[in-house]
From Swiss-Prot:
Full protein name: Transcription activator AFTR-2
The organism's place on the tree of life at top rank: Eukaryota
InterPro entries, sorted: OAF3, Zn2-C6_fun-type_DNA-bd_sf, Zn2Cys6_DnaBD
The species this protein was found in: Alternaria alternata (Alternaria rot fungus)
UniProt keyword list: DNA-binding, Metal-binding, Nucleus, Transcription, Transcription regulation, Zinc
Gene assigned in the entry: AFTR-2
Function, in words: Transcription factor that regulates the expression of the gene clusters that mediate the biosynthesis of the host-selective toxins (HSTs) AF-toxins responsible for Alternaria black spot of strawberry disease by the strawberry pathotype. On cellular level, AF-toxins affect plasma membrane of susceptible cells and cause a sudden increase in loss of K(+) after a few minutes of toxin treatment.
Amino acid sequence: MLQCAPKKNERLRGSCDFCTQSKLRCNKNKPSCRRCTLQQQPCVYSVARRTGRPPKHPRKANDCQEANGQHGDQDPVTSTPGGSYQQQSNHLLDVEGDGANFTLADASTTAQGRETAASPALDNALLVGETFGFSSLLDDPLIQSDDFFSFSLCMPPGEKEGHMASPRTLNGSTGPCSPTVLSSIDVPHLPARFGFLESSVESGLHGRTRPHLVEQPDKTVPSSFSEIEKIYDEGLTFSGLDSAINAVTNNGKGEPNISGTMAAHPHSKRQCFCSTSMSKLQMLVLHPTLCQKNSRARFDMALFLEEVVFSIYRDVLQCLVCQSKSLHSLASLCICTDWVIEALRDVAQDLSSGQDNLGGFRAGLYPPKDKFSICVGRFVLDDQLRESCTRSLVRYRLRKLIPIMDTMMKLNHRGAGGALSQAIRTMVEDVHHKIESALGMMEL
């Protein structure tokens, strides 16, 4: 009589207990395996505890189908609160093509962020590192706050604050590939205390409707409205491309609205925003007011950019995504650092020659009578004290940048041998020479 097959709960393991505990391969020879026979010990096969996949319950599927049938008469667009946003996301996905690497569900869940799908060409450019180097969210509250991209005019007392035109009023094109669709960032502006860069914009925008309320800009500042409109269009396009690059880097997730996301949520998905920080810095450094020939940057603007460079450098080293592995990022940061040191060296030269470039450098509500004075509230520094404070401040800022360049040189040794690595080494040595010459000039 044939023996029936054992039940599921009575089946034995394939390997004996001794081989299983010793993590050795068992030849599964029952009743005694080869290893247990050689060692002359009992070979025990325990009952297998593994169970199969639990059976499916078709009743739940039927319940879901019935629930879908009850709500089938409703419009899916009007029934959901985010229907209008899903239509907009569909439009963005259709515009960018089939190369987007995130779905419509991801776009609907992050409705507050900037959702921009990127094409495979941008993805390849980011991986190769041809145009942009790297992407960290600044810890500086000035950069993170909305005031960094808001416009606050410096009007005389008693006048109402003006309102800056939106990007859509400056850029007439509203096509699917226009910068307006690519980016939801407002036109980049400086805070109110850096209002000297906005005098030309104020005169150009308000010159059509009413007499402008600010002083005439210098000759080095562009004053025509067409030139200003071109500058804003270029900046808006740059911001749109930066949004697309962040979408590729972070798998379609835009820049978070809450500051310090990486520090507050260390276990969340890794996101890199170093390119956003570098883009903001480059847009300031390449501002037409700062890059004119035969003109020097304002001292307060140089100090502001020095703080931004130091913050970006610190955040890039702490970034868990890029970890300062990109030579393009080091080159971009080295160029911006070189510009800041050039501006500080100009201040040192002016101090050594008996002049200064402190026009308008003040912190307070009441402007000083002398435009070359430093005012803190109602307290105005005299010439000797002002020169001493300026020398100490410039010397401190220059010495603070020395360890930055030393670290750049150490990071550059990992990619030694290439043309870009050699260029970074040359730039770092040149910046070191500029710092030493400026410090020696101030000591003399």
